[in-house]
Amino acid sequence: MRSHYCGDINQSHLGQEVTLVGWVNRSRDLGGVVFLDLRDREGLVQVVYDPDLKDVFEMASTLRSEFCVQIKGVVRARPESQINSQMKTGEIEILGKQLTIINASAPLPLSMDNYQNNSEEQRLKYRYLDLRRPEMAERLIFRAKVTSSVRRFLDGNGFLDIETPILTKATPEGARDYLVPSRTYKGQFFALPQSPQLFKQLLMMSGFDRYYQIVKCFRDEDLRADRQPEFTQIDIETSFMSAEQVMEKTEQMMRGLFQDLLNVDLGDFPRMTYAEAMKRYGSDKPDLRNPLELVDIADLVKDVEFAVFNGPANDVEGRVAALRIPTGASLSRKQIDDYTKFAGIYGAKGLAWMKINDLAAGMDGIQSPVLKFLTESIVNDIISRTGAQTGDIILFGADKANVVAEALGALRLKAGEDFKLLEGEWRPMWVVDFPMFEKINGGFHAVHHPFTAPRGISPAELAADPAAAISDAYDMVLNGCELGGGSVRIHNAEMQSTVFSILGIEAEEAQEKFGFLLEALRYGTPPHAGLAFGLDRIIMLMTGASSIRDVMAFPKTTTAACPLTNAPGFANPVQLTELGIAVIEKVKTEE
């Protein structure tokens, strides 16, 4: 039905007859000549119909937005005065000779020209219309190019694309599972995989030493701008490769991806330990474009007569830190109050501050509600350590170390945006040496997942001091977003059982949930390591989209619903009976 895509027509086609199909983006009658912009996935081209061809002209006059049409015509150059530099095809136009209306369009339920006027609900309900917009089409085309580039790289490096099951067994990976009832085994359930983690490890044990898969994963968790109940991973696993080798190989893949598709050289991937990242940036995925850093000052204020400072400064679990914002002395009291409220979202009970109005004026040039508690010597030490200059403001965090990191880390990002401090476009990095476990409500939880190997210790040493263990894990971070995370895996049954025990998974439960893994670990398991990238997040960053919903064809809402299909929905009672499931109706009580 077509000879070319609309967006591909250019001056090399001058004088040629072409056949195009697509949708009417816009139609207008100017002085007895009908102009229409025809759109397909590759872009737009202008088509002109003049009255010389009466029947065709009259038909063209009836066209409205989103009519699906086929046109035949001759490519010609636009007059100099009508060249549109904003269009890829802006130097040419099609003189229409024939026109076929394939399908008319009903009045549109949403605006195609001013899509900002459409609600998120409307855009998702009529997604097939929203995806016709060039911006959305470009993102999905870009997504296809990314997956193609990834496949070429991995195929070329000896990786095998192997599928793993979608119907599997529930395993604890940090979020709730989506469950699928079994009709054959009534009362029993499959789970949709949160990741292919265990199956890809089993593939390593099977001898497939380089595996990859671009795979759907499912997590029933609270949603944010960068989360969806179903998402796509670039999943990678290797045998007989160290963490260093896995990082080198995947870094090479990411460099090639950005070079091929954006013509961007990502430069160096510096490495930073988890401890250093939390200390300097208050985050385990720091945005290195932001030059601001947290500075510890507990040693300077541990003896001041101010409990807000001296309490955390003398608490082994506490922290007192400062954040200098260049030119921040310009902040009004209301703006500081807004920053205080913002810090409160992350657990901070308040926000002490110090304005450096005039460094040369000594204490007279300093403004702060806590100045009366600080000696001139301490103030000078704080200014020296933070590098503050005249016109700057220093914000203070004093609390438990995790609260200070979260609150000042978030303020660091906010101030970086507010004061336009970001430097450079792309700043990749690796974060390494994560703790193996974290304490939550008195018990240990895996920082990554229960199959991550500790670095350089035996099962006995791990059991003796779990809190001190460092995992052999690594996260790739770009501009403050975690692109992917991975680790060396446990390949020893004793070590795996020890980790389960530390996590409170007793032997009987471990056998019930992971017996197949523990059994497999007994039969010559090779050392193996891997990594998984969030494909949706990578596309979001590379295209500049504000949400992963804008780089997925048919995403869910933030409440995990699909307005297009009205999913989820109620099941047929007959089907529920076959599955052995009874729905408990919520009974309304009379007041």
From Swiss-Prot:
Keywords for the protein's UniProt record, in alphabetical order: Aminoacyl-tRNA synthetase, ATP-binding, Cytoplasm, Ligase, Nucleotide-binding, Protein biosynthesis
Catalytic activity: tRNA(Asp) + L-aspartate + ATP = L-aspartyl-tRNA(Asp) + AMP + diphosphate
Predominant place of localization: cytoplasm
Entries under SUPFAM superfamilies matching the protein: Class II aaRS and biotin synthetases, GAD domain-like, Nucleic acid-binding proteins
Alphabetical list of InterPro entries matching this protein: Aa-tRNA-synt_II (IPR004364), aa-tRNA-synth_II (IPR006195), aa-tRNA-synth_II/BPL/LPL (IPR045864), Asp-tRNA-ligase_1 (IPR004524), Asp-tRNA-ligase_1_N (IPR047089), Asp/Asn-tRNA-synth_IIb (IPR002312), AspRS_core (IPR047090), GAD-like_sf (IPR004115)
UniProt GO MF annotations: aspartate-tRNA ligase activity; ATP binding; nucleic acid binding
GO-annotated cellular components: cytoplasm
Binding site for ATP: 219-221, 228, 482, 534-537
Residues the entry annotates as binding L-aspartate: 173, 219, 448, 489
UniProt subcellular location: Cytoplasm
Keyword Heme (UniProt): no
Enzyme Commission number(s): 6.1.1.12
PANTHER family: ASPARTATE--TRNA LIGASE, MITOCHONDRIAL, ASPARTYL/LYSYL-TRNA SYNTHETASE
UniProt protein name: Aspartate--tRNA ligase
Organism: Shewanella frigidimarina (strain NCIMB 400)
Chain's gene name: aspS
